[in-house]
Amino acid sequence: MQEKFMKLAVRQALIAKEKDEVPIGAVIVKDGNVVARAHNLMEKTQLATAHAEILAINKACKKLKSWRLDGAEIYITVEPCAMCAGAIVNARISKVYFGAYENKSGCAQSKYPVLTDNGLNHSTEFVGGVMQDVCANIIKKYFKEKRAKKS
């Protein structure tokens, strides 16, 4: 099941890449059904908060008519940053699955364990490395191409 939903998140990341956005995708699933999918839109919107996770959470909350996403799972192509990890915790998402680890800003495990911080009012389980090679290659290729264009 993890791979099935992560493939949908990968599809979202590829849509972002086509739009020249940082290729990160997110899918929220509840009771085995996809309730939201999104990809980064920071360049288009010029909003620092237009990360795939935040956009997917907003869509899921609207669809389910609740800010509490208890029992939901989120599939993300890259380990969430501090902002997104905080939003995941605040939304009460039950489990996070992510693909590529993000050593510079990942806040599930790599930099700071926001999702499992006992000092917060809620914590969220996570599984990292789901389709890791596929997810990591998408982001690496994107930034390699960006650097080549600057040269």
Regions found by a protein language model. Give the residues of each.
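Short, basic and Ser/Thr-rich N-terminal targeting/leader segments
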Residues: 20-24, 70
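Short beta-strand scaffold segments in enzyme catalytic cores
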Residues: 24-32
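Residues that line or immediately flank small-molecule/substrate-binding pockets and catalytic motifs
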Residues: 42, 76, 100
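Small-residue (primarily alanine) positions within well-ordered alpha-helices
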Residues: 9, 13-16, 26, 36, ...
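Short beta->alpha transition motifs characteristic of CBS
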Residues: 35-42, 123
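Zinc-dependent deaminase
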Residues: 1-19, 67, 80-151
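Helix-adjacent hinge/juxtasegments
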Residues: 46, 50, 54-91
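Active-site phosphate/pyrophosphate-handling residues
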Residues: 4, 33, 55
